[in-house]
């Protein structure tokens, strides 16, 4: 349900976040959908999850592993028992910078004040609600908050053939994921910390 709300909000950005300085806000959503693939060990769990998706009218469909290559010829379905895919243009990804810029512009128009500066310590703040937006640096300000920085490596891959309509694809048997980005692809895996010896460009 939260995802449905987010989707509806994203689609309404041109109206909801329109400002005098930013009359045409957008998050540049790419509605290629999500394709998630599961092995036999997670199939039953995913069938149950799919029932929940249907109850929420998410539009998620089940695809048998044996049928995958007929729909997505570039997919090797070896070891895949089942997959889920949403093909109703309701799922995809956005440009986070453009989205945050639109939110900031609207907040300023509504009276928000953005103060640039470096906060090195906090003594006492009286407020009903405090939101920390320090991200991975949160622990420097709030030592008791269990947030620590962690580096993740995402690869940009260029292939001879580009498939712009490809969905964001996740192979849950390996954890590897990828999606198109411009004329290339972004790809990653659970093992997201790599030795520089293997990731640095060749001399």
Residue locations for each model-derived region?
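Feature captures the FAD/FMN-dependent oxidoreductase FAD-binding
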Residues: 36-52, 106-114, 120-124
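Mid-domain catalytic core of redox enzymes
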Residues: 160-194
């Amino acid at each position: 349900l939260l995802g449905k709300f987010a989707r509806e909000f994203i689609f309404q950005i041109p109206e909801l976040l329109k400002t005098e300085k930013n009359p045409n806000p957008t998050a540049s959503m790419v509605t290629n959908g999500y394709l998630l693939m599961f092995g036999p060990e997670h199939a039953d769990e995913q069938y149950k999850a799919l029932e929940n998706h249907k109850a929420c009218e998410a539009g998620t469909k089940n695809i048998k592993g044996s049928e995958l290559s007929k729909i997505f010829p570039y997919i090797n379905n070896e070891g895949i028992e089942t997959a889920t895919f949403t093909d109703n243009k309701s799922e995809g990804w956005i440009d986070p910078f453009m989205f945050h810029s639109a939110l900031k512009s609207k907040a300023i128009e509504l009276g928000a004040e953005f103060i640039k500066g470096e906060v090195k310590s906090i003594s006492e703040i009286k407020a009903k609600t405090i939101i920390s937006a320090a991200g991975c640096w949160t622990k420097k300000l709030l030592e008791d908050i269990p947030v620590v920085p962690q580096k993740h490596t995402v690869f940009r891959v260029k292939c001879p053939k580009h498939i712009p309509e490809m969905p964001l694809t996740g192979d849950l048997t390996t954890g590897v994921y990828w999606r198109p980005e411009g004329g290339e692809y972004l790809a990653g895996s659970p093992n997201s910390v790599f030795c520089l010896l293997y990731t640095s460009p060749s001399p």
